[in-house]
Amino acid sequence: MHYWRKDFFESLKRTASSARAIGTWLEYADFCLEYERGLRRQAFAILHRFISDMERKPFEERRRFVSWLLTTVEGQEARHMLIPNPLQIQIVEPTLMEWTQVEPHCAEPHRWIGDREHLERALELDPDDQIARRKLIIQIMRYIDYATHHLPSVYLGSPVEDLAVVEKAEFLLKGIANETDKASLATFIAEEKTAIQEYLRGK
């Protein structure tokens, strides 16, 4: 059963086990288990009860859950299953925005909000935040990849300005600690930089 999405459903089981071990978010654990069993309607009924209860919790409890959840799902392809839209909209996003107000000098909520402005703010507050650094590099390079994806016929944007953006990604790359991540990102950056330079030489 579910063989074609086995990794996704294994993620649900692992996350349920982790939530149950903590002991505070048992309904979220039950949601994951019912979803893993393919019982979507029952799972979302449980999730809605959990959301209703969590919305009434103090900020500290909501922050603890959101921090645990986002740390748990980081890098997982099953993120959309572990954080369905109702949970994202009603708990995760409001809590993150409140967090930036309650703790203005904390990098973590900015890291998880994850747009370019907030990722840059996260690194201002904590230059050692590896997740924020990696996310920002990837976001910058996806923008560049969009600009170059019609080459050699057309460039979407300003290649000269985008070379400066690539140089920012190269600067950020120096702070990546994981050598595997660093090598992979370096290859991505080098390929895009070469594509822009070749386009400019051919003009």
Write out the residue ranges for each language-model feature:
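Long alpha-helical HEAT/HEAT-like repeat alpha-solenoid scaffolds in very large eukaryotic proteins
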Residues: H150-S184
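Residue-level detector of alpha-helical secondary structure
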Residues: K13, H48-I51, E167-L173, A177, ...
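Amphipathic alpha-helical repeat scaffolds of TPR domains
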Residues: S18-L33, A45-H48, S52-M81, V102-E117, ...
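Hydrophobic/aromatic side-chain positions at a characteristic register within alpha-helices
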Residues: A16, C32-E36, E124
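Eukaryotic intrinsically disordered, low-complexity segments enriched for acidic and Ser/Thr/Pro residues
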Residues: M1-R14, Y199-K203
